[in-house]
Amino acid sequence: FTVVKDEFIHNKVIAHRGAWKHYGNHQNSRHALRKAIELGCEGSEFDVWLTKDKYIAINHDYEYDGMIVELSKLSDMRRVVLEKGEVMATLDEYLNIIREQNRTRLVLELKSMPHNKIGLELTDAVVAMVHEMGAQAWVDYISFDYEVLKRVRALDPTAHIAYLGAVVPMDQQKIEGISGIDYHFSQFDKMPRLYDRARMLGLTINVWTVDDPKIMERMLDMGVDFITTDEPAMLLEMIEKRNKQ
């Protein structure tokens, strides 16, 4: 564990797959991460998969240029050249970038194909790498797979962990060590008591993916802890204006 001077930003803004929109950056790329850091986002969200040859690769979908990530070698996928000459990024590269500073953090989504055991294997590998690189202070974990989150908690008692799904009751989440909920913003319209219930249980609240300024305003008025967005600069400007009022 690396001792870090706590200068981390607390402005609620989580750049969804990094800051890519409007900047010519590929989603989940090194440039997108660096831009999120440059903008001053509280966090930069990204997605990880385990490749056939056991690398921890960064990509949103289960496919990458027609190749299924879990069934493909990293070297084959890296033959695909992305915007600005980049190739598929890996977790160690992201951790090296994020550890260059102590203002922006990572929000790491653990991904796997449904109904397989690779999710737990990925989880073990990810947490091990984060610990080996002393990057615990920079990394939060999220997933739709509840068993994956329980494994993270078993491996790291101090990590911040948020559940993306709505299957497991919040009471159970709290008992089993989940730190927060991470729901689509529409869930709070469907279930008006959701916010108050989460607050009563002491769970943090993240909402995704909020790109409409009117919904941004509504989520800020509600008082959520984090807002995941493809428009981080817009949200940052909105928050700055509100803070001056």
Annotate each predicted stretch with a short phrase.
Residues 1-245:
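Phosphate-group recognition and catalysis centered on beta-loop-alpha active-site segments
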